Amino acid sequence: MKRIIATALAAASLTAGITTATITTGAGEASASERTDQGQGRPDRYVLPGDAAGSRFEGIGVDQRRGLFYVSEVTGGEIHRGTARDADAEQWLAGDGTDGRYTARGITVDRAGNVYIAGGPNGIGNPDRPDLWVYSHDGELLAALRVPGTADAFLNDVAIGADGAAYFTNSNDPQIFRVAPAGDGWAAELWADASGTIDRVAGFNLGGIALSADGSAFVVAQGNTGALWRFATVDGAVSAIDTQGADLVNADGLVRQGNELTVIRNFSKMVATMRISADGDTVHRVAQRASDPDRVYTTAKVLHGRLLAVDSKFDEQPAPSGPYDVVGSPWA
């Protein structure tokens, strides 16, 4: 397998820990107390800091042990952090070139609290820019990496495997990259290439990724075709998952809770739920429901038993406006 050993590619300084951000509230925005679910003691939505020129968001990762969530900003690459019980999130990592990051997409957290960030097109046409980053829970830059073997990787989403490594999907080619510590640094390697099975077609190809219940496979969404694919964790072998004829076009984030899989269909403004086998091979009992018509949800994660979904603002043109939200229990 092709491998690249990590060192930081950008020397820009990083401020560890949470950086306090000023949050401008929009007209008619509810107060923090009004946004709180009094029965659970948690907000029903969380406000993200935004740029004066407008912001868009995409990924979310959660740290169950510390009760934290992290949200990636597409416009600039900032990373925001919040807690389960605080209605206002704060900027955690700066963007606009910090550590070579100008945009950010998928994000996840491992058991140690390390935060993995997919760069989307960050490195395309810019060989000195990383494709992905790894930070410790206190904000220390651990790795800023290019992936091997391709100059136009669009790293979309990321999930932690049963082996503790992080697996990143490529929305341009049907590839998955594995990132893990190696020696005295970090390594990114091409883990699976399904070019002989999955066709690269116009639009976003591989995106959302979730580990099966038994850890034997990743379930991966191909948004432009609405297909679901199974990648065996033992060797990366790929096979199609029969979705029972379900319309899953614009499939983006995947959330697995036990044997239920949720597929968030961003611009379709729909959410599909289905039963999925423990090995990720078979789905059945597919149901669809509309999501909020005024929001474009991209993905979600479960924090302390509750689903948190990112409102991307992707549908607001030419520039989005606040307030910017992560929504709790968005389609309960």
Each predicted region: which residue ranges?
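Asp-box/WD-like beta-propeller blade repeats and closely related beta-sheet repeat scaffolds
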Residues: 42, 126-163
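A short loop-to-beta-strand structural motif that recurs across blades of beta-propeller domains
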Residues: 78-80, 130-133, 175-178, 227-229, ...
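Secretory targeting and sorting signals
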Residues: 1-32
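Short loop/turn segments that connect beta-strands within beta-propeller blades
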Residues: 83-87, 136-140, 180-184, 232-236, ...
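A short helix->beta-strand "capping" segment at the edge of beta-propeller domains
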Residues: 36-55, 284-286
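Blade-level signature of beta-propeller repeat domains, shared across WD40, Kelch, NHL, RCC1
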Residues: 299-332
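Beta-rich, blade/repeat-based domains predominating
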Residues: 51-66, 98-119, 123, 148-166, ...
